[in-house]
Amino acid sequence: MTADDGRRRDDAAAPGHDVPTGSDGGQPSPAGGGSVQPVLADEGTTSVPEPEPRPKADATAEVAVINKPTAIGFVAPALGLIGVFMMFPAVWALYLGLTNYRVTGTAAREPEFVGTDNFTRALEDPLFTSSLWITLIFMAFSGVVGQMGLGFTLAWLFRRWRGWTRRTIEVLVIMSWIIPGSVVAFLWRAFLDGEGGTLNSLIPGDVTTEWLLRQPLLAIIVFNIWRGTAFAMLLFDAALNTLPPSHLETAKVSGASTWQTLRDIVFPAVRGHMLTTALLVSMWTFNLFTPFLLTGGGPNYQTEVLAIYVYRVGFGQGDFGFGSAVSAVMLVINLIIALVYFRVLRDRRKKS
């Protein structure tokens, strides 16, 4: 050891200087277990600076949030529109249902409060009971069974189709949904007309059946199925796209039939979507007024659904108080239907 080497070792061992050692107390070992710290170097040597520590994320950093006045400002326009166009008419209709308000006469100028008389009158009216049953039949067969059944069938058959064929069929189905109801009703009146109607022309022989008079309820059911199937098909198509292709391929390889695949794989997977679609279709069909454009509620009240019944007593007879009471009853029925669907959906989620 030279004198210079000894002087450097003594300087490194002086107070304030750490001398790195290896695991055996000797010279530092680069590959040893201990960490090597840089030694202060004299002139002519290169010092190794210690790496700067990375800044730690501040757990208490402020998160950008919208204050309450700003949030209210964003929500206020939507709430205002809902209040003006939905809440106020509903409350006003409920108020009118408790009065004898009419379009003309003394009741129009000075309506009187009659309490629940209008509701009792509606429940005792045989035409109201008949309209309620017609509405439930119309909703069940044209909405739940017809639209959902045909919509799911089309979505299942077209799920693997690609190219212009699928696009053409989808356009044709969706056109029946986006065309205005008045135009569709005019087309169906021409289709079902007894003299020169398209349907009678397609049937062999000299057929002159007045379908809107002979089978009015069946006519509006088929009309509504044709009209609303596209909506159900779009919803079911989106639901089927969520199925993993491997599940269907496994069922195919194992030799499962189409019904077994639907029963054991498809239906359990899209049951939530089916309940949601059933709720939307049911409530939409229950409040539908379009059959009035086909039959006007006739013949002999055979197609008078509740929406047409309210129109007849409210606008036809000018009895706004009674018509508003029937509207409130329809609102309650809609709420009951919605609660039943929500209850079934909640029970399914609990079981799953």
Language-model features and meaning:
Residues 1-76, 163-167, 342-352:
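Transmembrane alpha-helical segments of polytopic membrane transport and secretion proteins
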Residues 67-352:
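A structural signal for multi-pass alpha-helical bundles of membrane permease subunits
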